């Protein structure tokens, strides 16, 4: 089965992290930002990925395009229960919004993508959506990379695997896709700490003073936000800047043909800035679909910087990282969009998650599966 190929990548990477994970727990201290990927990396079984994607991305399309005939292909798709007439009327209005969507309008993100398992299956479902709308596989593969799939992770090596998996999936449908330049919105979250801010004066050549100053101010704001970004990952709250303006500012580089000690490394700085702009825009966007298996870690086990950030921005859900991610993913998802997550089940009954339950009460739950123990062989006795 094709799905097994990406599963192998994920399992190999999880077992690669076994020793670093054991070492992090054995030291009996706070988990550092370097250790968080190994400690929280947990590969999502294929059937759970399919269930989440089919009932979020798949449902979004099917509810707006009921005659597309796709849901018959989805083993884990659950039909909606019969609703009261008042609810049916509200749903009919929402589905008008879905019906107006074209395939390229649907942006999906996995903000904790790991090795990319969720993104790869989402690619398959998106391909079915595009084909049902009359696209060829070749054109659809390019469009999915450019318009639909987004992913983030704090782990650089996981990013490399996810990028590889997504591009190989694209090549499955378009054998020439690696021959040209293609946009792939899959990123390892990077920090701005190493940016040489003295180089900013070399950018914005040819722009008028108002635009140039606005771009510089916004870029400095982004760099400030992304300081120590690997401590926080996708829970970082990024403002929605004028991303086109920032890209034009960085592209308009001018050192007057002079090479000085001060200008050495400007091209490297431009490359770093463009990467940070891409990451920032991805974190600031709203998505029609958010699907992820978030990290499970008590915030008290994190270092002081993570603790302080969570208390400042997610104080109501500071018990565990998975609760923080429920709130964050809710904020990343458009109104009437779909959010699919695997979480531990404590949020349903423990007093420390009471505020989270209030957030969830304001969201319509389409379906929920209580898996019980041993859904993940690696988590002894835990329930999701």
Predicted regions, residues:
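Conserved phosphate-coordination/catalytic loops
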Residues: 43, 267-274, 316-324
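Generic alpha-helical segment signature
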Residues: 5, 138, 239-242, 266, ...
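Well-ordered alpha-helical segments embedded in enzymatic catalytic cores
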Residues: 48, 275, 324-328
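Class I S-adenosyl-L-methionine-dependent methyltransferase module
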Residues: 102-109, 118-285, 289
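Class I S-adenosyl-L-methionine
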Residues: 1-144, 150, 158, 294, ...
């Amino acid at each position: 089965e094709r799905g097994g190929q990406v599963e192998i990548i994920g399992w190999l990477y999880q077992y690669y992290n076994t020793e670093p994970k054991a070492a992090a727990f054995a030291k009996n201290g706070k988990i550092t930002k370097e250790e968080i990927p190994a400690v929280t990396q947990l590969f999502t079984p294929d059937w759970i990925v399919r269930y989440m994607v089919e009932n979020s991305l798949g449902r979004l399309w099917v509810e707006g395009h009921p005659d597309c005939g796709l849901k018959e292909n989805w083993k884990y798709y659950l039909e909606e229960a019969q609703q009261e007439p008042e609810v049916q009327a509200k749903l009919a209005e929402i589905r008008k919004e879905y019906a107006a969507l074209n395939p390229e309008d649907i942006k999906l993100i996995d903000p904790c993508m790991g090795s990319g398992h969720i993104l790869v299956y989402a690619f398959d479902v998106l391909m079915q959506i595009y084909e049902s709308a009359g696209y060829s596989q070749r054109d659809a593969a390019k469009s999915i990379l450019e318009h639909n799939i987004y992913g983030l992770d704090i782990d650089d090596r996981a990013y490399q695997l996810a990028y590889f998996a997504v591009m190989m999936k694209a090549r499955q449908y378009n054998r020439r896709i690696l021959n040209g330049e293609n946009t792939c919105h899959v990123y390892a979250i990077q920090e701005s700490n190493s940016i040489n801010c003295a180089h900013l004066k070399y950018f914005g050549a040819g722009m008028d003073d108002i635009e140039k100053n606005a771009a510089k101010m916004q870029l400095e704001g982004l760099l400030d936000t992304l300081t120590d970004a690997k401590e926080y990952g996708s829970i970082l709250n990024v403002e929605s800047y004028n991303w086109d303006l920032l890209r034009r500012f960085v592209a308009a580089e001018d050192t007057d043909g002079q090479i000085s000690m001060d200008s050495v490394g400007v091209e490297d700085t431009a490359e770093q800035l463009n990467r940070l702009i891409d990451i920032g825009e991805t974190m600031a966007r709203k998505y029609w679909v958010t699907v992820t298996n978030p990290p499970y870690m008590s915030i008290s086990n994190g270092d002081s910087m993570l603790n302080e950030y969570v208390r400042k921005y997610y104080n109501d859900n500071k018990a565990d990282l998975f609760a923080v991610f429920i709130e964050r993913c809710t904020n990343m998802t458009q109104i009437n969009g779909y959010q699919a997550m695997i979480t531990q089940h404590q949020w349903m009954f423990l007093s420390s998650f009471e505020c989270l339950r209030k957030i969830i009460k304001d969201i319509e739950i389409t379906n929920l599966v209580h898996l019980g123990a041993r859904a993940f062989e690696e988590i002894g006795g835990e329930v999701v």
